[in-house]
Amino acid sequence: MLLCSSVSGRSSQSGIFRDKTISSFSLSRSWRKSVMASPPILSLALPSDTGRVLSIQSHTVQGYVGNKSAVFPLQLLGYDVDPINSVQFSNHTGYPTFKGHVLNGQQLWDLIEGLEANDLLYYTHLLTGYIGSVSFLNKVLEVVHQLRCVNPNLTYVCDPVMGDEGKLYVPEDLVSVYREKVVPVASMLTPNQFEAELLTKLRIGSETDGREACNILHATGPSKVVITSINIEGNLLLIGSHQKDKEHAPEQFKIVIPKIPAYFTMMKFQTYCLLKGTGDLMTALLLGWSNKYPNNLDKAAELAVSSLQALLQRTLSDYRRAGFDSQSSSLEIRLIQSQDDIRNPKLTFKADKYT
């Protein structure tokens, strides 16, 4: 069992801010004037009504995937968001070429040590998306542990990006790490159909199967599960489940989602890995709204789906207006242009509760 301790090996501090008071007897008056305590981090000293999010995801200079899809929407919803970029690429890899760097586990830990050294590790939420190696995922688990040492009430929202439509984007050995180590410590999971099947070892061929997959995941750890897309007999569904306590059955619901005839930007890692900017956005919206409606996951999902669908429709409309074929183009989502739909979505999709 891991014990809570300072990541840098120094003595842990009793509060969020270290005492930087300097004895007046040890310094001259002129020197005392030049030595001042660091100003407080206002997002810590004066926290918002929403929270403070650490988001560990990919990043591209151009385009909207990973943190580029998640940070701005969460900020619009009132959150302070600190991004750590697991990769930094010039653009998504659907282009003829790309340049950039991949963060390794030690580099991630260096950043955590830097935050800890200045007592900046207090977060209300951790958000993770695409992770490309077992070593990096194991280091993320250490980050989860350390953040919960600082804030035991930390909410960990995990998008277990592994694959889609029967194909893995990541090394196969990541699946067991997600199933055995990550799921038990997550507060909310947002897998797609294929990822839910991998995590539960259950083939999802019906709504009943989707609900049972949520139950299996609840039994392992997370209180909230949203399977963001399930294709059943030509219909696309979102199935959500909230187990408020272990003594009662979870509250479950579905939202029917229209199919949009377009291929939105997916980010490839290595040969097979795809990371959808729309999926990253959806998980961020679910985090944002579920925190505002902590006991109404169905309401949070309605708002998230309504925002996302409005954004996708705007993206399609803008590309068509510019003369592009939405059937054949790899589209970049119109995130900035859709900020009103993110901040104040028109509720166009309703959840149907299972009884």
Language-model-detected regions and their locations in the chain:
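Glycine-rich, highly charged phosphate/nucleotide-binding loops
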Residues: 100-116
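Short Gly/Thr/Asp-enriched flexible loops that form oxyanion-binding sites at enzyme active sites
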Residues: 135-146, 236-238
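Conserved phosphate/ATP/ADP-binding segment of small-molecule kinases
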Residues: 168-272, 293-298
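Short glycine/serine- and small hydrophobic-enriched flexible loop segments
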Residues: 284-292, 306, 310
